[in-house]
Swiss-Prot record:
This is Protein PsbN. It comes from the Eukaryota. The keyword Amino-acid biosynthesis does not apply. Keywords: Chloroplast, Membrane, Plastid, Thylakoid, Transmembrane, Transmembrane helix. PANTHER family: PROTEIN PSBN. The lineage of its organism: Eukaryota, Viridiplantae, Streptophyta, Embryophyta, Tracheophyta.
Length: 43
């Protein structure tokens, strides 16, 4: 394969893995540890 193709594939994989990790952090088990500022300041 050409260098540009390998570079594009590696950047794409990195972007997909980062997006997957962000979604897991936002909606998976670690989301229970996130604080919600709207719940802290109810009127």
């Amino acid at each position: 394969m050409e260098t540009a193709t390998l570079f594009a594939i590696s950047i794409s994989c990195l972007l997909v893995s980062f997006t997957g990790y962000a979604l897991y952090t936002a909606f998976g088990q670690p989301s229970e540890q996130l604080r919600d500022p709207f719940e802290e300041h109810e009127d």
